[in-house]
Structure formats: structure tokens, C-alpha cells
Amino acid sequence: MGHRITTQNRGRGGPTYRAPSHRYKAALKHIGDGTKSISGSIIDIEHDPARNAPIALVQLEDGSKVYILVTEGIGIGETVAWGADVKVKNGNTLPLQSIPTGSYICNIESRPNDGGKFVRSTGVQAVVVDKIGDRIGVRMPSGKTKWFNARCRATVGIVAGGGRVEKPFVKAGNKSHKMRNTASNWPRVRGVAMNVIDHPFGGGGHQHPGRPKTIARGTSPGRTVGHVAARQTGRSRK
């Protein structure tokens, strides 16, 4: 009798496969609700295990401190602001209706006052391309144009940390430290390299699946490995 394979253990949601969110510093949401202007000064730039982009510690006018996403070109000592009537400059957060067409933006809200959901990874940016009534057209990093409510807020600028994917890890230890901060299962062992008790493709005198790799969508959890509900396998026919 076999036992649960790795995918089944991950699905259970135990601490081994759960993201270590107790190490994360902040959720990085926009400040306020957009009805009044708020400003603060950047006092430090830090690393957050939750993300690849750097974050900034900002001291607000009332003395409280918050973390924000850093955009390219801003540093310690600079002032950032939130509000509908603040200046359109790098690092400031405004409603989309207040940002001119052609501006680079990031950390865009999906709905007004949800804190920011889109375009938050290192080195990415979106562009305001169109305004029709209370809808704002934004060209996303994928190239697709997405329409937002005009009251949704966004930060002006490009997310800092661009070029990260061009730098190699060099050592397995570096990759290990990175993956340790996520819920990823790394390193990933091939099913054919496992014992027969650990995976449907395991065991045998040599490494081979030993059975068809295509599997139906509704198959029991321990058997849904390989090409699940595949439309086709092998080379595509033109």
C-alpha cells in the first residue's frame, strides 16, 4: 500500500508547505482612502522576504511609519504623497483619473481603495493609454489593455529592482535561500527517480514512467500526475 505523494501533502496545507508569512514585513497597501492628501518622508530602504522588489519605510506627518513599494529613482530623504490633488511625480500615488495619458504607473488597484493589486513585481510598469468617461485604459506589462475604474489609485513610476532576472543565482545555496521564503517545493525531484511507493512513475530497473502519462481530470488525487487532461502530447501538428 502506498502513501500520499508530495502533491497530496501540499494540498493538505500543513506548515511544511505553507508560505512563512510570519517573516513578511508588510502587505504594502496604499495609504488612506484618497479623500485627503497625506505625505511622508522615506527614512530607510529595506528588503522584504515576501517579494523581490525593495520596500521603503516612510514616516508620515503624524509620526506613524508605514512600508511602501519602491519605484526607480527615489531614495532616502525624499518625500512621497497620496491623494487626488498631489503632484504627479515619481513615487506619488493618485487616482487614475488624475494621472495624464502616457504616464508610467505601478501598484494599481483592482477596485477603489483595495490597496493595490496589479504591477508590483521588480522592474515592471504599466502605461495609461486611454480615458473614456469613468473608465481608464491601462496597457499592462503583458501588452493587454485593461480597463479600470477612474477612482482606482496607482503609484507613478516603475517598480525598482529591474534586471533581477538577468542575474544568475550561480550557486544552489543562493537559490535555496530564495525558495525558502516562498511556499515552493524546491529542489523538485522527478517522479521517475522516486521509489515505487512515493510516486506512480517510481520504481523499476531503469527510470521510466511505466504507464501512459496522460490522465483524466477526475482521477483520484494520488494518481493525477503527468499530463492531466491533455489535449495532445508530443509535437504540435501544423
From Swiss-Prot:
Keywords, sorted A to Z: Ribonucleoprotein, Ribosomal protein, RNA-binding, rRNA-binding
InterPro entries (alphabetical): NA-bd_OB-fold (IPR012340), Rib_uL2_dom2 (IPR014722), Ribosomal_uL2 (IPR002171), Ribosomal_uL2_arc_euk (IPR023672), Ribosomal_uL2_C (IPR022669), Ribosomal_uL2_dom3 (IPR014726), Ribosomal_uL2_RNA-bd_dom (IPR022666), Translation_prot_SH3-like_sf (IPR008991)
Pfam families: Ribosomal_L2, Ribosomal_L2_C
Disulfide cysteine pairs (residue numbers): none
UniProt-annotated stretches for the region Disordered: 201-238
GO cellular component, one term: cytosolic large ribosomal subunit
GO biological process, one term: cytoplasmic translation
GO MF, any single term: rRNA binding
Entry similarity comment: Belongs to the universal ribosomal protein uL2 family.
Subunit structure: Part of the 50S ribosomal subunit. Forms a bridge to the 30S subunit in the 70S ribosome.
Function: One of the primary rRNA binding proteins. Required for association of the 30S and 50S subunits to form the 70S ribosome, for tRNA binding and peptide bond formation. It has been suggested to have peptidyltransferase activity; this is somewhat controversial. Makes several contacts with the 16S rRNA in the 70S ribosome.
HAMAP family attached to this UniProt entry: Ribosomal_uL2_A (MF_01320_A)
Name of the protein this chain belongs to: Large ribosomal subunit protein uL2
Organism of this sequence: Methanoregula boonei (strain DSM 21154 / JCM 14090 / 6A8)
